[in-house]
Regions:
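Alpha-helical segment of the N-proximal tetratricopeptide repeat
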Residues: 40-79, 83-93, 120, 124, ...
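Helix-start (N-cap) detector for alpha-helical repeat units in TPR-like alpha-solenoids
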Residues: 37, 44, 78-79, 112-113, ...
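Terminal, low-structured helical/coil segments at or just beyond the last alpha-helical repeat
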Residues: 26-40, 239-294
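Long, contiguous interaction/recruitment modules in multidomain scaffold/adaptor proteins
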Residues: 1-42, 56, 65-69, 279-294
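Structural signature of tandem alpha-helical TPR/SEL1-like repeats
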Residues: 56-66, 90-103, 124-137, 158-171, ...
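TPR/TPR-like (Sel1-like) alpha-helical repeat modules
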Residues: 204, 208, 214, 218-249, ...
Length: 294
């Protein structure tokens, strides 16, 4: 699965802010209308909700325009900067996103969601130690958020701090037993550290929670094939690739935190005639994106 959860903070937390909106919806007010600071702020906050709705339908450019205007109308409201920063990150403008999120943090230093988003952005930039620091600070303010624990586990994993990574993934699972991406990633760590049987067990557990989850199925297939259980491995691998052919791409797997050991075995697996044929037959078929539990 994608190793960050885009727009989680926007969609999950804007609904909790209970933003007070003007009595009547107004797209753009006449410039001649005199408005006090409070009215301007309300208009800015109203625009943030418009932007969120646009982002839900992946209309990011339109959402960005409204978010930018919202920061001008309500520059002292952390919500507007938080939304703008999150949209920048979603569109891979990471430096601008971090700058906007830092502004949001200066306005609301106790808002954990800002720190979670900063941690995610720093992770995407490869600043793993900084990501750990932001995520840890956020979790002190708001503990037991599965997505944040998952991100923290990923940052530790990239720093090769494997026990810490597993601990954070396990905390995420303890909070949400159906959060299979964390279970899957424990398997990734186990495999890289030589515990093949342990990895397979975690991947099978992850697969049991979502019958559309291609990643843990393919990982299990590769591990079984490498162990010598070739027929079962090939059959499971075929099924996984039919679910989502993106996982037949080594670069995509690396982006999803598959380690060197597993990638090496996967390369061999993908070169087998049966899997090559499955991949070829899957070309052009629309992938069924895995659904991250909310």
């Amino acid at each position: 699965v994608p190793k960050h959860i885009p727009l989680f903070s926007i969609f999950a937390l804007l609904s909790l802010w209970s933003v007070a909106l003007p009595a009547q919806s107004q797209a753009l007010l006449p410039y001649t209308l005199q408005m006090d600071a409070k009215e301007l702020e309300q208009q800015g906050l109203s625009l943030t909700q418009d932007a969120v709705q646009l982002a839900r339908f992946q209309q990011y450019e339109l959402a960005m325009q409204r978010a930018q205007l919202a920061t001008q109308l309500a520059p002292k409201s952390f919500q507007t900067w938080f939304l703008l920063g999150s949209l920048y990150i979603q569109t891979e403008k990471l430096d601008q996103g971090i700058e906007a999120l830092q502004t949001a943090r200066s306005l609301a230093p106790k808002e954990a969601s800002i720190l979670f988003s900063l941690g995610s952005a720093r992770f995407q930039k490869g600043q793993y130690s900084a990501a750990v620091a932001d995520l840890q600070t956020g979790l002190k303010l708001k503990p037991d958020v599965p997505e944040a624990l998952f991100d923290l586990g990923n940052a530790y994993y990239k720093l090769n701090q494997f026990p810490q990574a597993i601990a954070q993934y396990q905390k995420a699972v303890n909070k949400d037993a159906k959060f299979w991406p964390a279970i899957n990633n424990i398997g990734l760590v186990k495999y890289e550290t030589g515990d093949v049987n342990g990895a397979i067990q975690y991947w099978r557990n992850a697969s049991s929670l979502d019958d559309k989850a291609a990643e843990p199925r393919l990982a299990t297939a590769v591990a079984l094939y490498a162990k010598g259980d070739k027929e079962q491995g090939l059959a499971l691998g075929e099924a996984a690739i039919k679910l989502d052919s993106r996982y037949a791409d080594l670069k995509f797997l690396e982006e999803n935190l598959w380690g060197n050991r597993l990638l090496k075995e996967t390369q061999k697996f993908l070169e087998t005639p049966r899997i090559k044929e499955t991949v070829a037959n899957s070309q052009g078929e629309p992938a069924q994106p895995e659904v991250v539990p909310q």
